[in-house]
Amino acid sequence: MKLKISLLLAFFLYLTVIPLSGQYVIKGRVSDAKNGDPIPFASVGLVGVSQGATTNFQGEFTLNSKYSADSLFASFIGYKKRVKKIKNGSLFQEIDFQLAPTDQVMAEVKVYSGENPAFSVLRGVVRNREKNDRSKLTAYEYDSYSKMELDVDNISEKFREKKVMKDISQSIDKFEKIAGEDGKLVIPTYISESIGKFYYLENPQRKKETITKTNIKGVGVKDGSIISQLVGGNLVANYNFYQNYVGFFGKDFASPIGDNWKDHYNYFLGDTVNVDGHICYKMDFDPKNPMDLVFRGQMWIDTTSFALVQIDASVEKGANLNFIEKIKISQELEQTSSGAWLPARTRFLIDLEEITKASAGMLLKMYISNKDIVVNKPHPLGFYDVASEVAEDAMKPDPAFWKYARHEPLTTSDLLASALIDSVQNLPIVRTYVEIAELVVSGHRRFNGLEAGPYITSFAINKVEGARFRLGFRTNANFNKNWILRGNVGFGTKDLVTKYALEVNYLFSNKKWTMAGIRHSYDLERVGLTPDLIGDNKLFYAFTRWGAFSGAFFRRESEAFFTSELSKGITLTTSLNTRSFDPLFRFQFRLNPELGTASEVQDHYQETFATVELRIAKNVTFLMNGNERIALATKRFPMITLKYQHGFKGFLGGDFTYDRFTLKAYQTFRLGSLGRSDYTFTAGYTPSNLPAPLLFPHLGNETFFFVRSAYSTMSYFEFVSDRFASIQYNHNFDGLLFNRIPLIKKFKWRLIASGNILMGSQRVENREIMKDVNNPLRSKFLDRYTFDSLDPNKPFAEVGYGIDNIFKILRIQAFHRLSYLDHGNPRRFRIMASVNFSF
């Protein structure tokens, strides 16, 4: 009887436990507690039971178990392990984990016999790079879906006390707050999604992205024109770890599978795992010097092809970077029909630290999903001319389109972020902060279609004008997409002269960038410091308006111009100008220097000239900003400008017939762990006989503000040439030296060095034009300048060195003048400063 009861009890347990055991299902998501970013390949398991699962690229997991347990754990390298209780008797549960980052460093691995087993795998990766790297492809393209989100995080107590935060908190109290389990509030300020296609051509290298639809919502986002060109993400986040260095923020980060992998990383080879059907080596990598620009993380290498299948790489706070709490790149790659691997999914995260205790941090998250990959089918070269194209109806709402076109549905967090932005962006205090931010960034205050500014040039005090007041304006695309107006008016309290400028442009095409316009202006300028010589450095130009204002002259100028992009990266500009020169210093020249003292003397002049300029910028990418365009710097090739000018005597009052030729080449390039460099080569020549201001006055710098294009130990208009060649070279070593010096390395300083060499001369005929001329009409002016020439056999040279990144924004440089040390009152040694915002 007892045996029957025992058998019956056992049979009952079999019927109740065993069938139900197959129905225990636990689903969930593992994410970073600080920023909400998913954690791929995290381990999830039942406590006390040898059964578990790993998360996918989205950080999601599904655990099916025959056994029950009272708790579930989640763990991943670089994060604190977390355990949660399981509801007893529940057959289906959802449990999410938020793992807190830890500062732990990978334990040292000692190999007592033979080499590290990871090294043979890495050599296999390098050996098979040519067949696995996407660079072997002549071209590729794919459908792409991307999401981008910008949040405010790390909200300090002082920042919470600000009125803007109190108003925001009241607005979002009705919503469920977006936060991790650590309770830290995250406030979304911008969210976008886009869908389109990405095209790549290897030789010559071209990138093109077309945006079919985009959905943008953000605090302060008034016009999505330029933002819509960036939301695709492939133009800025197309990372390739097969290259020796992965570049972003103008920095080079050593790849863990690059040629120099052994110099930068420690490696630990783990077990083999299955990743989407590929049996892979799991490998951890850790920086040898945490301050270097390197990664920490894990990667999965295919055991057959030695291809990179997936990587999870982070740059942490200890690296020599500014304002960065963390950078994280997760990439999942897919093999194409050609054998090369392309990214199927990419996650990119930047966590910016709070700059002060009274501020907050920022969090940028980007996700890109690619599918329907086509390889080795290049389009005609002209197809790639426009780097970013946005469909005319791209921003038109279309819920039905998004429902079927998204590669995956929006998450609950995405939907909540969108609702929060709608609530926050209409607050008056938020709109005020947005307007202040726009003013700081652009220098202009927007009033719908009109923008006032730039404010940096609105006021100055100098000895000629007294207090100078200036008000400027420009129109934007809200005024008119084709017509562009600019102008300003100024007045000096001492000279009592009104200055003004007006410009009218018409944009014929923004694809081939074809524009025509006219300008007219009357203003007080300085020899060698005019806007056409200084360029776009508005800060330096504003500084030159203050103080003694030596070399001053009034200029009246009229110009008509036409510019057009002939082909990708090649722009032609033609113009006709008439320009006067009326100096406020003792200035005279001989109209006919061959007559010597018998020549007629003149103290002012007028020139009429035509200009043809050809600019070649290979591989440059342009983005449209309304009716303006912004150039993203070309990397591998120099930007070259060729200019020819011809003066017409007797036409529109011109006093001279002349020819001028100039050549300028500028290039910036990165040298991996050695830092980054840039150089500017400039040359000019005129065969004509002209007064000094019409030759080539070399740009000196008498301020304490460093200007890259100026000679730091040269005075204003100290030297003038009718033929010259110069090279200006700058190099930033980043943390190459200071990262290795104890005590100093904690400051994250960066060593910089520079050198400038100028060769030039003046022909005798040009020196005779202004030699020993004494015009009593100009005797009332005390200032007189010799406009000396350089010795053709003796270059002007100066060298500089200094420290960058002092307090994260300040650069201090020392300059030594190496030649012309007995010329006048030379500036042999100078200390200069500049503000430099960089990561």
Please report, for each region that a protein language model flagged, where it lies by residue.
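Exposed, low-structure sequence patches enriched in small/polar residues
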Residues: A10, G247, F253, D385-F839
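Structural motif
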Residues: Q23-V25, R29-I39
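Short Pro-Gly-centered beta-turn/loop motif in secreted/extracellular proteins
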Residues: G36-P40, T62-A69
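Hydrophobic beta-strand segments
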Residues: A42-L46, L72, V111, Y142, ...
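A short, solvent-exposed loop/turn motif at the edges and junctions
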Residues: L46-G48, S71-K84
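Short, acidic Ser/Thr/Gly-rich low-complexity loop/linker segments typical of extracellular
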Residues: S50-E60
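Extracellular beta-sheet/turn segments enriched in Thr/Pro/Gly and aliphatic residues
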Residues: K87-S113
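Structured extracytoplasmic
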Residues: D103-Q104, Y112-C280, D286-V294, T356-G453, ...
